[in-house]
Regions:
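Helix-turn-helix DNA-binding elements, focusing on the entry/boundary residues of the two helices
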Residues: 7, 18, 29, 44-47
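DNA major-groove recognition helix of helix-turn-helix/homeodomain DNA-binding modules
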Residues: 45-55
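Short basic helix-loop element that most often maps to the first helix and adjoining turn
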Residues: 5-24
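A detector for short, charged/polar N-terminal pre-domain segments
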Residues: 1-2
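Recognition helix of helix-turn-helix/homeodomain-like DNA-binding domains
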Residues: 25-41
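Alpha-helical and His/Cys-centered functional microenvironments
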Residues: 12, 22, 33-34, 45
């Protein structure tokens, strides 16, 4: 499973839209979309926030 697939899976388990996750991370919805398609990777600070949000 790729990082993007994992982000998408965790987001969907929370029943969140990409927009909701983006707001929680202070990024654009497009950034979340790129991550989920593995076209971009979150920066370290965003990875740490993702870990906190989904733990």
């Amino acid at each position: 499973m790729t990082m993007g697939e994992k982000i998408q899976l965790l987001r969907k388990k929370q029943n969140w839209s990409q927009e909701i996750l983006a707001e929680k991370l202070s990024v654009s919805r497009q950034a979340v979309s790129l991550w989920e398609r593995d076209e971009s990777q979150p920066e370290l600070d965003k990875l740490l926030k993702l870990a906190k949000i989904f733990s």
